[in-house]
Amino acid sequence: MATIEGIVAREILDSRGNPTVEVEVGLDDGTIARAAVPSGASTGAFEAIELRDGDKDRYLGKGVATAVSNIEDKIVDELIGYEASEQRLIDQKMLDIDGTDNKSELGANAILGVSLAVAKAAADSAELTLYRYLGGPNAHLLPVPMMNILNGGAHADSNVDIQEFMIAPIGAPTFREALRSGAEVYHALKSVLKKKDLATGLGDEGGFAPNLPTNAAALDLIAEAVEKAGYRLGTDIVFALDVAATEFFANGTYTFEGAAKTAEEMSSYYTKLADAYPIVSIEDPLAEDDWSGWQTLTASVGDRIQIVGDDLFVTNPQRIARGIAEHAANAVLVKVNQIGSLTETLDAVDLAHRAGFRCMMSHRSGETEDTTIADLAVATGCGQIKTGAPARSDRVAKYNQLLRIEEELADAARYAGAGAFPRYRSA
């Protein structure tokens, strides 16, 4: 196998106009591969550390020149000569160099950039697609796209508390048809909003961001859009939410729709919402440290709804193991930059799957044209991907990559569809 001959790092811009890290890895057989690192807006307290410069005179303190320098000065020389196929050894070497539990010395953005670029280079050198290189011969399942078509919370300048209102086209026969139906509902929603004189400006992830009287009003608008687009709600298309509850949790209470609520009251709200709407998945319904609340909600509705831990788990195997042991949540959101290396991400997915937890591959609100997570979704067979609305190049780049993968797989391709949500039963 080809060995690492050179590594180049640079500062580029993400979809929010903030700097992020891009890395190129060159091998001795002439292969060159590139990877860019995403960045979140609502971040969990237990995520690996994304290193920012803090120099207010440069990119308002958000520069990543230090992370780039760490790659050039502390990582490059240590990895020259490694076989690119030795992903686990390479990732472990970077963790050893860093020497911290949260990657605060080198920066998770530095480590991840190198980790992903190495994997891409190894795949290219082996003349394999990334999903086939990582997933082997059984990588054939196309994920359900969880399209965030109405944005609130930290992703939008609106009064809507819930961060993401998503549609999942579970009734489509193929990924291509799922993407088409999602795009048609997205455009229908814009028409519905305009007809009601509601704002059609976009949030960070390409979804519309109107001010609304209640969070349930968002679901009513999307339901109208689904019908307008000619689809059946609950059968063709279902709902999913990312509440990001940590964002409105303080001093033991949740400030939701203008009122202070307990974990029990929030759980009751979600139960009623699930009774009224075809919701298959709720992400981060409670705060990242409210373990007892998570246990109660999972026991209450976990048999019929996917309860997803994002800030709760931060793609960290140790926190996922605790969630499994304590029956808190029944699914894991997977974000490569939360844990900060490819092998740790794959370990997290493996741990979740072995425990019967579902996994949802996810982007971040600050994205680039990098399509790695599309390949990862197929490689891991997770059956679900969350990468924003079917709009804006940073979002559709992932959807378009999945179209290419489905086309390449041809008759071997399978679309996850309703099978991705075994707990959900349509009315």
From Swiss-Prot:
Transmembrane segments: none
UniProt-annotated binding residues for (2R)-2-phosphoglycerate: Q163, K335, R364, S365, K386
Subcellular location: Cytoplasm; Secreted; Cell surface
Residue sites binding Mg(2+) per the record: D242, E283, D310
Gene Ontology terms: biological process: glycolytic process
InterPro entries given in the database record: Enolase, Enolase-like_C_sf, Enolase-like_N, Enolase_C, Enolase_CS, Enolase_N
GO cellular component term of the entry, any: extracellular region
Catalysed reactions, as listed in the record: (2R)-2-phosphoglycerate = phosphoenolpyruvate + H2O
Top-level division of the source organism's lineage: Bacteria
UniProt cofactor(s): Mg(2+)
Binding note for cofactor: Binds a second Mg(2+) ion via substrate during catalysis.
Leader sequence residues: none
Family stated for the protein in its record: Belongs to the enolase family.
Main function: Catalyzes the reversible conversion of 2-phosphoglycerate (2-PG) into phosphoenolpyruvate (PEP). It is essential for the degradation of carbohydrates via glycolysis.
Protein name: Enolase
Organism for this UniProt entry: Salinispora arenicola (strain CNS-205)
Name of the encoding gene: eno
